């Protein structure tokens, strides 16, 4: 493992901008509004050859522990456990505030080395704040501008004596780990995104899987803003072995007309982006509300993106008429998602843990189908049988000739059908072939792409 460096500070001092600067990507949402970050976010950082894991945290606020800001602070405090260094960030232009002083008192009680950073130090406006920062008791602050990348060399000099040797120790282990990883199929890490409407229990579900309060939860809708990726090992009780999973928690997605807040728009866009990087997407429903139109829109979006889809009815422990609810949702899904019938539907409880092993088992199975490749010979044997059972129509008395089919890609499975006059092939016959591929060749409820290709007419102008 790399050395771990966490970023701590009050809201809106530029912690997420610093995080993005160090990882070299815009992974964390950034806005002028304070309190954008709510959950811890991890990233691989490299600073002038110094490699470490950087952790962005929620802004530190002096609030009651039962409130949302109070629970965010508890998450930030928990991030100190196991950290090698803490970057304590203040706003040089604002100077030292009473909340900065409170954070400093807390950090002085910790055994974690502290690097004080005076962010927003570009120009002369930050000079008084840099001078004030000495009063916090952590020595000379690193004058920095996360927005413009100024002060990277000074930060490197501050971190090198604290994690440089640890990085050298880890490098040897890393080389061994890389050698071991080369023996594994890269498909073995399941990239699993959790999506759904706000307050469906997505973060509670992930916390139950992990066995810790890793993500903020509560009755307030829309707590999660960033898409948070967590690498984790699931113990498969059937195999009696651990299997690697990358869990991706996303912001709740409401109807577009209801999304007026700029931050929520950023969060929904981030959730859509997370789906792109997932292999399997679990759409979480709230059993107390059932299936709504917005759920079908989210499911359709996942299918359009070509991801393997599963539906999990959460809060099953408080569902009324469970049997009727399950059957009603099953029927509505089959009618509303005609392009992918038989999507896996599971009843779970993020609070009690009911059905979670079954959920992970089904996720690995549908990912295997999503990644499957059928040999061309076997594919065309099925194709010949399908044509014999139901020949293509002959519009206007002229026969549509279907020659052969091949699988062009996987993840999602994509097939190319070759023939003549394919522009006149009815959509119903195309669906017949897609459903046959899914049913007969073991693709289950995976989205299938079928491209029609006719030979070019050499005499056409």
Curated annotation (Swiss-Prot):
Short name of any one Pfam family annotated for the protein: MMR_HSR1
GO MF annotations in UniProt: GTP binding
Sequence ranges assigned to domain KH-like in this UniProt record: 372-456
Biological process terms in GO annotation: ribosome biogenesis
EngA-type G domain mapped to chain residues: 3-167, 190-371
Keyword Repeat listed: yes
Binding locations of GTP 2: 196-203, 249-253, 314-317
List of residues binding GTP 1: 9-16, 56-60, 119-122
Keyword Nucleotide-binding in record: yes
Keywords: GTP-binding, Nucleotide-binding, Repeat, Ribosome biogenesis
Database matches in PANTHER family: GTPASE DER
Recorded family membership: Belongs to the TRAFAC class TrmE-Era-EngA-EngB-Septin-like GTPase superfamily. EngA (Der) GTPase family.
Subunit architecture: Associates with the 50S ribosomal subunit.
Matches recorded under NCBIfam families: GTPase_EngA, small_GTP
Role summary: GTPase that plays an essential role in the late steps of ribosome biogenesis.
Protein name as catalogued: GTPase Der
Organism (species): Novosphingobium aromaticivorans (strain ATCC 700278 / DSM 12444 / CCUG 56034 / CIP 105152 / NBRC 16084 / F199)
């Amino acid at each position: 493992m790399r050395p771990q460096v966490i970023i701590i500070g009050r809201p809106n001092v530029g912690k997420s901008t610093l995080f993005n600067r160090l990882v070299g990507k815009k992974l964390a949402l950034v806005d002028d509004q304070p309190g954008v970050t709510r959950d811890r976010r991890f990233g691989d950082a490299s600073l002038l050859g110094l490699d470490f894991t950087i952790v962005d945290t929620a802004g530190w606020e002096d609030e009651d522990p039962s409130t949302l800001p109070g629970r965010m602070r508890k998450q930030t405090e928990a991030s100190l456990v196991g950290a090698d260094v803490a970057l304590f960030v203040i706003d040089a232009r604002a100077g030292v505030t009473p909340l900065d002083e409170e954070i400093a008192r807390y950090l002085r009680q910790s055994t974690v080395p502290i690097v004080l950073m005076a962010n927003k130090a570009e120009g002369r406006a930050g000079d008084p704040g840099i001078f004030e920062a000495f009063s916090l008791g952590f020595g000379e602050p690193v004058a920095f501008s996360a927005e413009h990348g100024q002060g990277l060399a000074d930060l490197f000099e501050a971190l090198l004596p604290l994690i440089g040797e640890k990085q050298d120790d880890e490098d040897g282990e890393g080389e061994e780990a890389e050698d071991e990883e080369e023996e594994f199929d890269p498909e073995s890490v399941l990239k699993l995104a959790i999506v759904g409407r706000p307050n469906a229990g997505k973060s509670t579900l992930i916390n139950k899987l992990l066995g810790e309060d890793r993500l903020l939860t509560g009755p307030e809708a829309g707590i999660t803003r960033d898409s948070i990726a967590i690498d984790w090992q699931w113990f498969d009780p059937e195999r009696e072995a651990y299997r690697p999973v990358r869990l991706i928690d996303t912001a709740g997605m409401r109807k577009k007309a209801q999304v007026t807040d700029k931050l929520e728009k950023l969060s929904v866009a981030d959730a859509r982006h997370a789906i792109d990087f997932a292999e399997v997407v679990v759409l979480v429903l709230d059993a107390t509300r059932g299936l709504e139109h917005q759920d079908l829109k989210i499911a359709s979006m996942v299918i359009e993106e070509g991801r393997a889809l599963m539906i999990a009815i959460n809060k099953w422990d408080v569902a009324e008429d469970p049997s009727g609810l399950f059957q009603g949702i099953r029927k509505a899904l089959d009618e509303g998602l005609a392009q992918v019938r038989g999507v896996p539907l599971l009843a779970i409880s993020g609070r009690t843990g009911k059905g979670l092993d079954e959920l992970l088992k089904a996720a690995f199975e549908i990912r295997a189908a999503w990644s499957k490749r059928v040999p061309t010979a076997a594919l065309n044997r099925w194709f010949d049988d399908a044509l014999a059972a139901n020949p293509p129509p002959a519009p206007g008395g002229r026969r549509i000739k279907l020659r052969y089919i091949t699988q062009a890609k996987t993840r999602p499975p994509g097939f190319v059908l070759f023939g003549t006059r394919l522009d006149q092939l009815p959509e119903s016959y195309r669906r017949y072939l897609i459903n046959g591929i899914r049913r007969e060749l073991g693709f289950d409820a995976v989205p299938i792409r079928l491209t029609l290709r006719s030979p070019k007419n050499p005499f056409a102008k």
